[in-house]
Amino acid sequence: MDLASKLFKGDRVIWVIFMFLCLVSVIEVFSATSTIAYKNANHWAPIVRHATFLLGGFVLVLLMHNIPCRFYSLLSLLLPVSMVLLAITPFVGVVVNGEPRWLEILGIRFQPSEIAKIAAIGYTAFILSKRNWFTDKQMFWYILGGVGGVCFLIFFNNGSTAILLFAVTFMMMFIGQISIGRLLRLGGAGIIGVLMLVGFIRFAPDKVIDLMPDRVHTWKARIERFSDPADAVKFEPGRAVSIDGDDYQVVHAKIALARGGLFGKFPGHGQQRDFLPQAYSDFIYAIIIEEMGIVGGVFVLLLYIILLVRVGMIARRCDKLFPKFLVLGCGLLVVVQALTNMAVAVDLIPVTGQPLPLVSRGGTSTVISCAYIGIILSVSRFGANMGNEEETPEEEAALNFIQAVKDMKARFGIGDTCLLYTSDAADDK
């Protein structure tokens, strides 16, 4: 067995997708962080920081995919811990970009919401797998209580993350065959609640909005920009327009998409990376299309689609419920977040602030995204029969036992009859 086979166990397709996404990330983040490099007067500092987090995430994948997936049921224990961290973040959190979303402990800065997401997935998978412990009604309310509490704590600082986590949990409950009636009522209440909130924020007087948390002002600006019917009129040919305010990011993202063409301008030759404030994060997909063209954009999209398809195949071949729901939850969270980021970049939905998993520049988000891949690979290795060349631990133990019997036969001259008798006796048991 060569070194690659020893290191990269589990589903080979997932490994290939992970490597490609990391490669795209290094190339595009290096290009998109040009403004940061200019401000810091250090050409290499931004990409070295990002590459360090990617390397740490890669090591984490290597470690996690060697841990049997049954141990990830312990993730559910992180849920109450993450809720405490989320509760204290608004009061003692580190303010970055005007929002206290980060905590700093022993010099390490992280986002509690990212920890809460992976804990919520593990918790939901654990509850759904215990059908012999809980009734359908109990599972529904336990999941709604635990994940709903996390979403509530996340919502006012990061509404899009709360909605994303709630949607993925809802899909997990649907796949887990929770009563369709309960899910319809929950889904209907959620949709009505979001529509009412959007309507209130959109049409409420500014005096009322001023009394609410600062984050509501950001939501209002994004909703108004997205629903502005005069958007097309402002950009008539031959008319000079000042691009600023809430239009700034979205308009420059559209320019990046328009410049990309079929094959793009080649990495490092994009222009809009110098104008988009979040070119390396929220709008990195627009930079990918500008520099790699529609071909590159479709390629990245297909990587995520294939990832979801492969996760579905792994889940279908799981004999036990916990790894099945765990791998589905991790896969859905990564892919739905990726599709959300892409939809923002092409102006299909309002700006959400969601990074592109495994591609956007980040710290906690990059490491946690790698953790999802590590869990998926662990399930493909220990929880599902994917036709890999490696044996499961049980198969390896059986083969070692058979080899030991053969060695004993050769050493003591035991005949075939005795060996056959031993095999038959084992079969009778």
Where are these regions (language model features)?
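N-terminal membrane topogenic signal
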Residues: 4-17
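Hydrophobic alpha-helical transmembrane segments of multi-pass inner membrane proteins, especially
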Residues: 15, 19, 26, 31, ...
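Transmembrane alpha-helices of multi-pass inner-membrane enzymes
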Residues: 23, 347-391
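Transmembrane alpha-helix interface/packing and boundary motifs in multi-pass membrane proteins
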Residues: 151-156, 262, 340, 346-355, ...
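Long extracytoplasmic/lumenal interhelical loops at the membrane interface
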Residues: 244, 249-295
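Conserved small/polar residues in nucleotide/adenosyl-binding loops
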Residues: 421-429
